[in-house]
Amino acid sequence: MPEHEERHSHGVNRSLSLGSSMRSLFKSQRSRGPSDRGANGTPGPAQKVDIRVDTASASREHTPVVHKTPQSANPELQQPRHHLGLPNILKLNLTPTNSNPQSKSGSPVSQNTSQESLITDTDIEVEDYRPSKDSRRTVRNASPMSSNGNLPINANTVIGPDTSSNNIDSMLDGTGLRPFYEEADSSDYIENLRSFPLPTGHYAPGFIQPPKSPTSSRVPSRSNSRKGREHAGTVSAAQLPRYNETPGKCILDLEYFKLYEDGHHVHTLKVMTSVNSDANGNSHNHASKNDGHLDLPKGDDGSVVRQKSKFSLSGFFKPHSKEDIANADEKLKYAVSLLPRNKICSKVETDRDTFAPVFTKTRSHVQSGSDDSSDDDEELDDPSIPKIVNKNAAVGSQELKLINNLSEKIRMGLSTAAKNKHNQSSKHRTPSGAGVQDENQPAFADLYGKCVAVVGHGAYGVVKVCARTRDEKDDLPATKTYMDSKKIYFAVKELKPRPSDPIEKFSTRITSEFIIGHSLSHYYDKNGEQSAPNILSIIDLLEYNDTFIEVMEFCPAGDLYSLLTARKNKIGKPLHPLEADCFMKQLLKGIQFMHDHGVAHCDLKPENILLHPNGLLKICDFGTSCVFQTAWERHVHFQTGLQGSEPYVAPEEYNPKKEYDPRLVDCWSIGIVYCTMIMGHYLWRNAARGKDSLYDSFYEEMASKKEFYVFEELRHINQEINRLRRIALYQIFQPNPEKRISIDKLLQTGWMRHTKCCVPYKNIPR
């Protein structure tokens, strides 16, 4: 027999290896480490693994480069330092002083689960702004995912081929090395995410419900298989016990938050009582009235004192009588939309084009109520309009026309209402120059239903919840608000000028709040793409006499402030670290979207952050937002003056003679919001030197020691993730804004890259 045929025969005898079996099992053509094909033979998501070589030793070509980091680089972390002479920080509590004490050691994870196992300790860190700390890039050991709840390793972890004798077995039962799927493709993320959705029929827009079972395409095939292993016939990965529709092991089960062994989590926030019961008081489910969002204490005797806020959808919930609700319906009955439309339909959320503004050619068309838009294209080419140089800006030509349109209608409506103030005959008459009543236009109740509750009070009016019966036309993809199995809900904010407010000032505020919110929440609707999931959807603007009505998406879990206060009162603790990290990432993503389109919020605080029961976060209240770059501007323009609520205001805002970047102000405010989530109280009341002793202490320690004792004493579920978070906090809280980290870079830090979020952002355009 020729030599080459003998070698071939010998190779055939050795072909009964598990490598061939694995190729048959997963229908992979080649075995080159992780498979590039799914279980059905179609290309699956790429498994990105960063392989590094230690050039110091060629013999360790495939050995991970490991840098050991001491368990505690700073001995002061072992024992909290107590600073004498400082005011009691508990005075900054969001809750009464007689509430349960706050836990300083962080929320426990599980009695039988090691906290060190919950977060992978791998990372490639960004530049550390603290010169006293070691900011070298470190890589940790890649530990297999074990059955006791350890999380998978990060995709950037330095790993080498596994030559152990049981590596194939570990792959089959799911305990082998599997890449951490944070920020993977959306399809890959969804396949790996085990979902515990809302009760049947409930839906929150922007939240993608993943399938029950994870994907099989993530199981890698190996070329270094063992010899002589018996193998079964070809089966699908779904038939393996690991990939059956068996939910993952829950390692942390709280009333409001669940954590699973693969690292994903589920929020189970309470729904308002007003949503659980209809106007007749018929309960739709068994939610408790003491759901943690109602009847917040208020007063001067150590109880909750909110920062000044225009509105809150859940903060001051009070039950209202049927008579109050009937009066509200009577007022809303005559409300007329101020938005010009090219088409009227009976169901507002079933057609996206319904809310696309139709901009008229001249102001005479606006005053006459004409909806003629045939010359829109010609108007866009008008030489009097500056050339658009920033197509990503949220405020462009159409928004400018809508601003002029609404401002004119609001001014005329208020002027006419003032003249008819004492005329009883004008009680149910729409003011001249405002929205023109049309017998073909559907009534308010047909579009948004009837009032079921009054859930908020503010300086300019009240916030109500309206609901109507859900029908087959209310398809989920087009709907921009909350619904259950029977009804669809809308938040309705009434805005009425105070006697001391000039008409021009009130008109500017309404127009600014509506235009910014509407343009951001509908930015991608023009192109038929998915909109930003963390921006509250603004739907319509209507008028009745001197009252203006803004219709918005309804978030039935209330605002973040109410959640923090209720949690502190009920269990005496702030949010779980992983829960707060998820909210932090969503908040950063939402503000990143705003900044990418030329808008800074300038008033970020828990009262302006709304929540859905599944944990989906929504940013609201754009009344004080700053448009720092329009479609006609190439460069960012700064601003001056104090904006926002005191505990969240950045230090540079207190200098009236100096301009500041509003984007960096938002970053500072986000840091305060996060610390409030994990500590249960503000860091300080005022970030101006000489006005607050706590801020003075922070400033002096940062200047002398490059650290702040409050940040040093914070604890997370894992020492490494705690270190990464601490680095990010120091980058956020830079008193000098020129040294402060941006939102984009903050999302690239190791802390945020390790944070698993409820919303898959990979395929959502920025």
From Swiss-Prot:
Residues 372-382 have a biased composition (Acidic residues). PROSITE patterns: PROTEIN_KINASE_DOM (PS50011), PROTEIN_KINASE_ST (PS00108). Its main location: cytoplasm. GO terms for cellular component: cytosol. Belongs to the protein kinase superfamily. CAMK Ser/Thr protein kinase family. NPR/HAL subfamily. HAL5 sub-subfamily. This is Probable serine/threonine-protein kinase KKQ8. The active site is at 603 (proton acceptor). Residues 449-752 form the Protein kinase domain. Residues 94-120, 140-165, 214-223 have a biased composition (Polar residues). Its EC number is 2.7.11.1. Pfam families: Pkinase (PF00069). ATP binds at residues 455-463, 493. Residues 1-165, 201-240, 277-297, 362-384, 417-437 are annotated as: Disordered. It catalyses: L-seryl-[protein] + ATP = O-phospho-L-seryl-[protein] + ADP + H(+); L-threonyl-[protein] + ATP = O-phospho-L-threonyl-[protein] + ADP + H(+). Residues 14-25 have a biased composition (Low complexity). Residues 419-430 have a biased composition (Basic residues). GO terms for biological process: intracellular monoatomic cation homeostasis.
